[in-house]
Design a protein with these regions (language model features):
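Long, His/Glu/Asp-enriched segments that create or flank divalent metal/ion-associated functional microenvironments
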Residues: 1-247
Length: 247
């Protein structure tokens, strides 16, 4: 309702209805300590296989203020609305999917909602700022790991000491970054893509004549592509046949 009341983006009625929730397995929580989104909100929370201390770390890491801060990243207008629209607009462009667009869009909304005053209480503001710090820390530890400047244990300590993560959650976060199929730039793509979309918003909406809704609808309907190419498409800039984006 916060999104639609401000006419920020079109949310089809069906998109509101078709998402669901399920509990994340204890095994998966070892690499995904926080809830995930898409057409299903997968809840990371204490299970009966955890020790008491592990349950407390899970509760603290998924407290209501931290979770409220990223619900729009995972659900609407984030990954759930993304996936809903991608199935309906230009699905052939899925071959050109990039995390700079996919994750950048979700993080862009975290920044925009902060600007719009979505965080109403000091606790909610801390929740949003915690995740902002987390996104930045991901860039630092993941790139340093791939450059062989940090070990996994050093990455865990970095998240505990510099971000304030619970140790179990920091360990799972590091596993997620390195044990899966993520490329070396995946974690950087959140922030870089988000900042690129933010800059495009400034150009077309804040300094241009586009409305928020027009801008956000256009991005979703163009499907996934490098943000520089998206800008060229939205501005109808001429492109040569061999043109390549710098990002």
């Amino acid at each position: 309702e916060y999104i639609t009341a401000r006419d920020l983006v079109t949310v089809p009625d069906l998109a509101r209805e078709v998402w669901r929730t399920q509990m994340m397995s204890p095994e998966r929580q070892r690499v995904s300590p926080f809830f995930l989104g898409g057409d299903t909100i997968i809840i990371s929370y204490p299970t009966d296989t955890m020790t008491h201390e592990e349950k407390l770390m899970s509760l603290r890491g998924n407290n209501p203020h931290f979770s409220r801060a990223v619900v729009h990243h995972e659900l609407i207008p984030g990954h759930h609305l993304q996936q809903f629209m991608l199935k309906r607009y230009r699905p052939y462009r899925s071959e050109f999917a990039t995390p700079f667009w996919m994750e950048g869009w979700a993080l862009y909304w975290e920044m925009l909602l902060w600007d719009l005053g979505f965080a109403e209480t000091p606790e909610d503001k801390i929740g949003m700022l915690f995740w902002r710090k987390h996104r930045c820390a991901r860039i630092i530890f993941s790139l340093n790991y791939h450059l062989k400047r940090m070990t996994p244990d050093e990455c865990i300590e970095y998240l505990v000491d510099r971000v304030g993560h619970e140790r179990n959650n920091a360990t799972a976060e590091v596993r997620r970054s390195f044990a899966g199929s993520y490329g070396p730039l995946y974690q950087a793509a959140y922030m870089l893509g988000g900042l690129q979309i933010r800059q495009l918003h400034e150009e077309l909406v804040q300094k241009g004549s586009w409305s928020n809704r027009q801008f956000h609808d256009a991005i979703l309907q163009e499907h996934s592509m490098p943000i520089e190419m998206l800008r060229a498409k939205l501005l109808q800039l001429p492109l040569e046949a061999d043109w390549q984006p710098t990002w």
